[in-house]
């Protein structure tokens, strides 16, 4: 009887052997580590913080990301999507945070102004989460397919920058950097193609490790940070001072929070498509609550920034086929450990950017491919769906291809449309309402088309996800 129950359990709720979960969890961390630490480094540098305080922001970001990931994957009451979603500091908030911080004079004063705005935005987002649930019918396949595709497209320039050695660096585009990225990608492809079972599923992790080893003899790996890093550090509440609450900063951050919630909704729907468990309204609300609660705690206590689901890890789930949320929970534990033990974080930080770029090409491209697969299910015959897809993708790609296109527009407009993801989502929703209205055949989200063949529906799984 116990064996039958185990066989019926949805892959999302399966607990794998401990060794496998650690390896798969580490692979998730290594694929998103650079994205997590980039935000505090950018903001901290702009605020003029010394190296020690920059390192403090970095460990705080890792700690917050880990706690948020645990909240999202395991869930508490009605909080958490209970999906294999990795949480991390959100790039969507960077521009607004820089404006808020510089407006407050930079330094610690700038950070406290940012934290005050983050706290209020998180609370507002938490209260608005059920409204997003009621708006779920606005995300039929033609909309979610567009958004998922643009998520992948918007992430690809990040991997391009990494592959070149880091955008803005003196040696950007050096053939040696590009060759290293190419070697890493070829290693991943070779492992994925020729090695069986478990080995093919850790192709990304193996590619990162082997790519780093290849880079070492050529002086591309800097291990000095490992010796300099502390063994243990804890992020104490209000390290930079009590939060400051300014109306203009709060309004700006609330707008950003709405953008982040839109992106997180798309990620929840995307991972639902990948894992074969349709994302219903309860799942979306739980995921948004986890996002916004973690953001509130991040700004209020842990010296962190807004968090959101990381789309690149959706691609990793698609590549590996490992759908267990407990694997991603292990990722959260690893992130917490990295946040408490900076020396461990310094080891991962030693991975050269070109190596990350090579792996990112496979990861981010897979996200875009998932969106294209979703769009292949849309009915284009006798409908206006083709023009909806065309214009929405164009609006999403516009700020990616021309980052300064909206520089003369008001700041609130830039906050929304400088994000290709939110621009594509808003355009697709409005055009779908214009051409398709809210008729029944356009209401179901992409993941609601029916369970993947061979997958046991959630409600039929003994011991499956709770109703919380």
For the regions a language model picked out, list residue spans one by one.
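Generic transmembrane alpha-helix signature in multi-pass membrane proteins
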Residues: 40-44, 94-106, 133, 157-164, ...
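Short, non-helical or kinked segments that cap or interrupt transmembrane helices
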Residues: 56, 78-92, 137-146, 199-205, ...
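N-terminal signal-anchor module of multipass membrane proteins
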Residues: 2-85, 92-104
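Hydrophobic, membrane-embedded alpha-helices of multi-pass small-molecule transporters
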Residues: 19-36, 173-185, 203, 216-218, ...
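Membrane-embedded helical hairpins/re-entrant loop segments and their flanking transmembrane helices
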Residues: 18, 44-82, 252-325
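Membrane-embedded alpha-helical modules
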Residues: 102-221, 331-445
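Intrinsically disordered, low-complexity non-transmembrane regions of multi-pass membrane transporters
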Residues: 1-24, 223-238, 273-277, 434-468
């Amino acid at each position: 009887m116990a064996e039958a129950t185990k066989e019926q359990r949805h892959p999302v709720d399966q607990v794998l052997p401990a060794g496998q979960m650690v390896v798969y969890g580490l692979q998730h961390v290594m694929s998103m580590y650079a994205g997590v630490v980039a935000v505090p480094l950018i903001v901290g540098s702009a605020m003029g913080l010394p190296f020690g305080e920059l390192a403090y922001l970095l460990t705080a970001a890792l700690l917050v990301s880990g706690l948020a990931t645990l909240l999202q994957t395991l869930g508490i009451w009605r909080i958490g999507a209970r999906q294999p979603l990795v949480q991390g500091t959100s790039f969507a908030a960077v521009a607004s945070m820089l404006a808020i911080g510089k407006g407050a004079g930079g330094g610690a004063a700038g950070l406290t102004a940012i934290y005050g705005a983050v706290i209020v935005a998180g609370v507002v987002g938490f209260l608005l989460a059920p409204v997003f649930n009621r708006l779920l019918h606005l995300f039929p396949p033609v909309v979610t397919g567009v958004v998922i595709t643009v998520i992948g497209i918007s992430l690809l320039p990040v991997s391009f920058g990494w592959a070149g050695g880091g955008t803005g660096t003196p040696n950007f585009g050096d053939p040696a950097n590009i060759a290293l990225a190419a070697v890493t990608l070829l290693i991943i492809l070779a492992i994925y193609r020729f090695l069986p079972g478990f080995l093919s599923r850790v192709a990304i992790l193996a590619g990162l490790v082997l790519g780093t080893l290849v880079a070492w003899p050529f002086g591309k790996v800097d291990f000095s940070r490992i010796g300099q890093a502390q063994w243990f550090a804890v992020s104490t509440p209000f390290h930079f001072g009590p939060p400051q609450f300014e109306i203009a900063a709060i309004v700006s951050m609330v707008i950003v929070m709405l953008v982040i919630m839109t992106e997180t909704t798309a990620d929840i729907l995307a991972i639902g498509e990948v894992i074969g468990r349709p994302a219903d309204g309860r799942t979306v609300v739980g995921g948004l609550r986890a996002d916004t609660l973690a953001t509130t705690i991040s700004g209020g206590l842990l010296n962190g920034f807004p968090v959101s689901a990381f789309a690149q890890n959706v691609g990793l789930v698609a590549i590996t086929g490992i759908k267990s949320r407990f694997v991603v929970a292990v990722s959260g534990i690893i992130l917490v450990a990295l946040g408490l033990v900076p020396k461990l974080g310094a080891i991962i930080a030693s991975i050269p950017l070109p190596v990350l770029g090579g792996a990112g090409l496979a990861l981010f491209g897979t996200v875009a491919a998932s969106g294209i697969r979703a769009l292949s299910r849309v009915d284009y015959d006798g409908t206006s769906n083709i023009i909806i897809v065309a214009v929405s993708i164009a609006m999403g790609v516009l700020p990616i291809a021309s980052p300064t296109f909206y520089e003369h527009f008001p700041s609130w407009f830039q906050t929304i449309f400088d994000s290709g993801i939110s621009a594509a989502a808003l355009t697709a929703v409005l055009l779908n309402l214009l051409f398709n209205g809210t008729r029944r055949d356009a209401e179901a989200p992409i993941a609601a088309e029916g369970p993947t063949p061979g997958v046991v529906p959630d409600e039929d799984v003994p011991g499956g996800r709770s109703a919380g």
